[in-house]
C-alpha cells in the first residue's frame, strides 16, 4: 500500500526511460529490481542504471524478466519499430506522458480495408475510451497508467 504517491516522470521515449517510469510507478528501487533479477556484487544496481540511462539495452529474456517484475506488458517496454503500425500505437500512448494534453482523434479517419489501419484505429479508440474515463474521474490516474502499462493490442479484429 502506498502512503505517498509521486507521479513518475518520463524523460523521453527511449526504452530506458520507459523502464524507469514503470519501476517508479511500481514504487520500486533499482536495488529491489536488481535483487529480484538475481544481480549480485557491490554494483548490482549498475545494470539497471545502464538500462534506464540507455547505455545498455536488455536482451529479450532479461526484458521479459523485468516486465514480469514490474507487472507490465512487455510491449510497454520493448524497443519500438517505427515501421510497425502496432508499435506506433504504443508510442502514442507514451507520448501522452511527455505531452499531457496530446490527443489523437481517429473518429474522422475513413474505414480502410487495410488490416493494420483497422487494428490501429480500434486500439486508439480503446485508448480514447480510457482517456475519457480518466478525464471524467471514473478511474484514477494510477488505474489509467496501470491500463496503459498492461494494454495489449489484439491483432485479430
What are the residue ranges of the model-derived segments?
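Recognition helix of helix-turn-helix/homeodomain-like DNA-binding domains
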Residues: 38-58, 79-83
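Short basic helix-loop element that most often maps to the first helix and adjoining turn
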Residues: 12, 16-37
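Long, hydrophobic alpha-helical segments
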Residues: 59-63
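Short, charged, amphipathic alpha-helical segments
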Residues: 141-149
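Short, charge-rich amphipathic alpha-helical segments embedded
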Residues: 152-157
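Conserved hydrophobic/aromatic packing and binding residues within compact polymer-binding modules
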Residues: 19, 30-34, 45-51, 66, ...
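Charged, helix-prone or intrinsically disordered regulatory segments positioned adjacent to compact structured domains
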Residues: 4, 10-13, 21, 64, ...
Amino acid at each position: 500500500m502506498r502512503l505517498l504517491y509521486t507521479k513518475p516522470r518520463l524523460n523521453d521515449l527511449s526504452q530506458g526511460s520507459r523502464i524507469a517510469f514503470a519501476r517508479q510507478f511500481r514504487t520500486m528501487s533499482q536495488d529491489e529490481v536488481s535483487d529480484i533479477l538475481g544481480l549480485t556484487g557491490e554494483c548490482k544496481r549498475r545494470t539497471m542504471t545502464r538500462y534506464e540511462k540507455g547505455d545498455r539495452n536488455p536482451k529479450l529474456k532479461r526484458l521479459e524478466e523485468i516486465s514480469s517484475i514490474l507487472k507490465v506488458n512487455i510491449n510497454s517496454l520493448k524497443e519500438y519499430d517505427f515501421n510497425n503500425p502496432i508499435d506506433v500505437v504504443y508510442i502514442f500512448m507514451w507520448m501522452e506522458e511527455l505531452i499531457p494534453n496530446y490527443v489523437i482523434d481517429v473518429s474522422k479517419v475513413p474505414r480502410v480495408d487495410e488490416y493494420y489501419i483497422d487494428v490501429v484505429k480500434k486500439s486508439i479508440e480503446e485508448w480514447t475510451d480510457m482517456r475519457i474515463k480518466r478525464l471524467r474521474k471514473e478511474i484514477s490516474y494510477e488505474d489509467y497508467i496501470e491500463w496503459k502499462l498492461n494494454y495489449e493490442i489484439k491483432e485479430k479484429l
